């Protein structure tokens, strides 16, 4: 798969996985890792009436909790469920998915017909998560040159980090 990126080994992809998801695409529960991003939901809802200023819909990023109510379910999955009740497509476009935390909003550019299809693929296979990363690098962010510059030198990684995570990447 790394050959699709013109690479000869998997060191770069492993480094991305380590930064994006601590190296795993799965929670201990067996569910794929997601991060519900309330500011993305706010952006994607089609009707302003469905915008509820709360922990699951807000114009400001934040409130990334793991299990605030201690029920054993990752909060991102709970927030996603509540958002789906308001606006399903917007909700599914508002999560970053899997080992490489690719946003659901990029489902079409990554070759899926719907964001639920992208989430389902990533829930079934780690290989699908790797394929999603390759598709994102080549088709969405178009950051292959920055990917090829990744190295153990942090300065050489900045261009990729900025392109992959946006201008505010240093906050994370």
Predicted regions and their residues:
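Catalytic glycan-binding domains that act on GlcNAc-containing polysaccharides
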Residues: 2-172
């Amino acid at each position: 798969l790394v050959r699709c990126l013109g690479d000869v080994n998997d060191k770069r992809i492993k480094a991305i996985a380590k930064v994006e998801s601590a190296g795993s695409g799965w929670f201990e529960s067996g569910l794929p890792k997601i991060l519900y991003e309330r500011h993305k939901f706010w952006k994607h809802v089609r009707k302003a009436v469905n915008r509820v200023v709360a922990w699951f819909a807000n114009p400001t990023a934040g409130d990334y909790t793991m299990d605030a109510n201690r029920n054993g379910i990752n909060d991102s999955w709970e927030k996603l469920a509540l958002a789906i009740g308001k606006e399903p497509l917007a909700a599914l476009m508002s999560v970053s998915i899997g080992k490489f935390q690719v946003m659901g909003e990029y489902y079409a550019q990554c070759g899926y017909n719907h964001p639920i299809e992208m989430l389902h693929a990533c829930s079934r296979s780690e290989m699908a998560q790797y394929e999603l990363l390759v598709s994102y690098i080549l088709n969405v962010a178009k950051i292959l040159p920055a990917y090829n510059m990744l190295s153990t030198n942090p300065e050489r990684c900045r261009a990729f980090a900025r392109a992959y995570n946006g201008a505010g990447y240093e906050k994370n």
